[in-house]
């Protein structure tokens, strides 16, 4: 159950009617069908008629964002669907949890999720992408306020460009969301990351909110940001956000290499060069909630950056000749409503325009001066009908057009155009037998250009044996399909026109337990085992330059993994609150394509066997409303290999970091607050590399002062 902006109830159902009588399941189902048959006849006719129109027209688009986390304005509180109601329990960071982390961007925060591997090239401006459960970055879709962020060029999203300053929640789902009312395209990803920006909410007497902050730190970091929320009318509001980021990226590091016989080959201390960044982000949003179930939302986003691309350090040779300019702009509209209390419709529309300019000045490498212009149009519509109180069905259709213009400014005659038409059609059903058994099934048809359509199914189950004990057994099986990107197929010195599509099969079983008591505000324990099999897996790894990659089909990869998570909030005497968050992952991801290969059954590149994180926070709230907190975080990534062959030459050492932060927040005047945060990252100054030959910063500091009204 969720709460609308004005306190109305969205999607409320009677709990009494959900309990099974003491009769056989078959008799119970028959009685429920007879009781509601008349009521549902006209709904089914209307729904199927509209679905037929949708299938013919095809000009549709779906929204991933829902009313599952809205605001009660009068009480100024956030309500969200209980975790125990989800078949797939997401990993989430929201609100105060995000502020507590020593994180500058979304990529930094995602490191604290289990089963996630982050590719980070160092510094504020280094490109950052994620890999979930070793499936590959292209199998992980990123959604911004409910609509996927596309990149037909390379299929990867640089998460370093998304700030945490205006972020309300980050959620990671393995498989897919538990709600079948979603865009068809969402059923086709192995994992989904949902980024939700702050929505404005006001007390009855409030009309304007203002946020302003300044962050400064090591490596000449300067990061001012400002935000304004305006209440235009009842249920109508506008948001404006802007941010600037600068850093020279010059941080000290130690480069050391030891030969297999133990002799030191290189041991150098130097300062990282060409890691500077100048970036500007501006966003505007318009929100209109016109009923308890209906709203529309418009969002405009623009990001521009100029950065150096710090090169790899190989055999004590520095490469610092690469520069990168990015501009990412998109406008998106979302609308959804509910009719007759049972039929729900959601539609989305998006236009994106992305520009990239890449230059390589390094004389030791081939010169490069390339421009890329991408355009994307995305349409979707999704419908859901409640056939019975225990049975929902949904149908969704998505269409996307991508166009890429590539121009080589060195070779004037080298100009290329690529385009792609993609269609997704999904049918899903959800059954809820009391709160004991939840079952979902979906089937997705994907067609890209003139390729033959590919059908991928998914089945999800959640069993809760005891009503009074919040213990659930969750499992799913899913297939997902990924077509090679433009870079995979055509990019010079990297592309491979003979690449075959990937097909992934996921199996997962999870045991989850949740407890809420007076002192234990929230306790969540979960253990997940998963087995994934990827056919014709496409692997990308650096080839001396982080902007260029080498692409190849590995054939078959088998992935086995175990994720464990623990999350707890504990109320202590004297107004203290202790928060703990622990994650651990063990996984093997091996190439089993050809027994004659030298890397047969070797761990694939950059997948550690062991990884984990820990976050602890102690908060204190005074009687006058001031807040103070001390936060500690720890991240560990075990040994791994940087190439296909697991040899001593390709070995990448494990690394770990300790981060510490201290904050104070004061009410200086009524509704005016001032917050000061001090951070120390990599507390003990460890030398480490996330990507081989790309050294990371040692100990560094940040200070943030923020004002809110």
What are these regions (language model features)?
Residues 70-101:
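N-terminal periplasmic "start-of-domain" segments of outer-membrane beta-barrel proteins
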Residues 107-148:
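Extracytoplasmic beta-strand/coil segments of soluble accessory domains associated
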Residues 164-211:
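A beta-strand signature from Gram-negative outer-membrane beta-barrel systems
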Residues 197, 214-220, 244-248, 290, ...:
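Transmembrane beta-strands of outer-membrane beta-barrel pores
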Residues 249-251, 269-282, 287-345, 351-376:
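Flexible loop and strand-edge segments within Gram-negative outer membrane beta-barrel domains
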Residues 276, 287-289, 471-476, 507-509, ...:
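Conserved C-terminal beta-signal and adjacent last beta-strands/turns
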Residues 321-338, 465-534, 542-573, 604-610:
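Outer-membrane beta-barrel signature, preferentially recognizing the C-terminal barrel domain
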Residues 433-436, 525, 529-533, 553-641:
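Gram-negative outer-membrane beta-barrel transporters
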């Amino acid at each position: 159950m969720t709460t609308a902006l004005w306190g109305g109830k969205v999607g409320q159902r009677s709990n009494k009617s959900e309990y099974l009588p003491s009769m056989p399941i078959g008799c119970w189902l028959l009685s429920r069908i007879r009781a509601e048959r008349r009521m549902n006849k006209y709904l089914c006719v209307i729904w199927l008629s509209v679905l037929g129109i949708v299938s013919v027209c095809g000009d549709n688009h779906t929204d991933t964002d829902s009313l599952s986390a809205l605001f009660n304005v009068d009480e100024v509180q956030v309500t969200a669907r209980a975790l125990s109601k989800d078949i797939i329990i997401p990993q989430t960071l929201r609100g105060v949890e995000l502020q507590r982390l020593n994180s500058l961007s979304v990529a930094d925060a995602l490191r604290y999720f289990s089963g996630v591997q982050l590719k980070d090239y160092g510094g504020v401006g280094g490109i950052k992408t994620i890999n979930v459960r070793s499936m590959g970055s292209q199998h992980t879709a990123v959604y911004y306020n409910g609509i996927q962020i596309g990149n037909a060029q390379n299929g990867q999203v640089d998460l370093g460009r998304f700030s945490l300053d205006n972020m309300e929640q980050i959620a990671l789902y393995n498989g897919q969301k538990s709600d079948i009312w979603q865009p068809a395209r969402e059923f086709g990803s192995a994992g989904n990351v949902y980024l939700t920006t702050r929505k404005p909410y006001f007390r009855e007497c409030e009309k304007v909110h203002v946020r302003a902050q300044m962050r400064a730190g090591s490596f000449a970091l300067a990061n001012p940001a400002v935000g304004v929320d305006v209440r235009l009318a009842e249920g109508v509001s506008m948001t404006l956000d802007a941010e600037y980021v600068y850093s020279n990226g010059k941080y000290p590091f130690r480069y050391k290499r030891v030969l297999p016989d133990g002799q030191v080959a290189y041991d150098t201390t130097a300062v990282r060069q060409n890691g500077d960044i100048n970036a500007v982000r501006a966003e505007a949003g318009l929100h209109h909630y016109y009923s308890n179930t209906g709203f529309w939302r418009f969002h405009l986003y623009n990001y521009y950056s100029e950065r150096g691309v710090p090169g790899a350090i190989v055999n004590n040779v520095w490469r610092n000749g690469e520069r990168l300019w990015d501009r990412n702009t998109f406008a998106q509209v979302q609308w959804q409503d509910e009719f007759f209390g049972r039929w729900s419709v959601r539609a989305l529309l998006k236009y994106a325009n992305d520009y990239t300019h890449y230059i390589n000045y390094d004389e030791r490498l081939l010169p490069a001066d390339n421009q890329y212009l991408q355009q994307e149009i995305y349409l979707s519509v999704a419908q859901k009908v409640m056939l019975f109180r225990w049975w929902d069905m949904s149908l969704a259709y998505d269409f996307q057009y991508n166009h890429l213009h590539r121009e080589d400014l060195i070779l004037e005659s080298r100009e290329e155009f690529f385009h792609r038409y993609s269609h997704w059609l999904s049918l899903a059903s959800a059954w809820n037998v009391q709160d004991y058994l939840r079952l979902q099934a979906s089937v997705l048809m994907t067609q890209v250009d003139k390729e033959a359509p590919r059908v991928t199914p998914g089945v999800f189950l959640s069993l809760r044996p005891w009503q009074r004990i919040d213990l659930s057994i969750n499992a799913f099986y899913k297939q997902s399909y990924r077509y090679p990107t433009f870079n995979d197929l055509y990019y010079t010195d990297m592309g491979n026109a003979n690449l075959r599509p990937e097909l992934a099969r996921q199996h997962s079983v999870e045991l989850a337990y949740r407890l809420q008591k007076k002192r234990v505000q929230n306790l969540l324990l979960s253990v997940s085992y998963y087995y994934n099999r990827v056919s014709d897996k496409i692997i990308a790894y650096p080839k001396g330059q982080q902007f260029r990659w080498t692409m190849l089909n590995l054939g078959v990869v088998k992935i086995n993994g175990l994720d464990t998570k623990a999350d707890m909030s504990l109320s202590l005497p004297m107004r203290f609150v202790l928060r703990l968050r622990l994650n651990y992952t063990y996984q093997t991801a091996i190439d089993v394509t050809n027994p004659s290969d030298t890397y047969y059954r070797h761990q694939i590149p950059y997948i550690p066997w062991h990884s984990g994180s820990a976050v602890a926070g102690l908060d204190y709230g005074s009687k006058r409303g001031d807040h103070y907190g001390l936060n500690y975080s720890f991240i560990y990534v075990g040994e791994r290999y940087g190439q296909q062959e697991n040899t001593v030459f390709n070995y990448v050492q494990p690394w770990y970091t300790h981060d510490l932060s201290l904050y104070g927040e004061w009410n200086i005047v009524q509704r005016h607050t001032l917050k000061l945060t001090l951070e120390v990252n990599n507390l003990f100054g460890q030398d480490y590399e996330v990507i081989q030959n790309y050294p990371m910063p040692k100990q560094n500091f940040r200070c943030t002062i923020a004002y809110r009204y």
